Amino acid sequence: MREIHNFLPISLANEIHDKLTSNEFPWFWLDDVTVSPEERSEVPDFYRSQPGMHHTAYRDGSGLSNWYGDFSFFYHYIIDALNLEWDQWYLSRIRCGLNFPTFREEHFLHNQPHVDFPESSQVDHFTCLYYVNNSDGPTVVFEEKEQSEKYTIKY
């Protein structure tokens, strides 16, 4: 895992923030940001649902949203930041997420452990997270790569 601070120039970071928080950007509701509705019944009761919003700007095989052009540059920045060969990697998905703050007495440090994009788990890949704000705390990464009875926090 690598953490890259100041990944974007400030002016570009501000532009992305303003687009995502404008009243023109289309967000779509998710009952739970960690699992699909079909998988929710498999989640232990102590991990309550974490609602949020999403917008998938690009998904391999599904096409582009009208906002794809506003986010497509991320791929090139990532390739450069990770020093990868551009012709050896391809883009699988660009997904914007907006998680809501969690206000519960039993608030955990993390949500249900999950894989962000299960379709990509069969091949070597990178998952890159870019935070526009800090509305719901840090992302937690676990040592375990398979479903487990107990999870160990890696980061």
Predicted feature residues:
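Non-heme Fe(II)/2-oxoglutarate
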Residues: 1-88
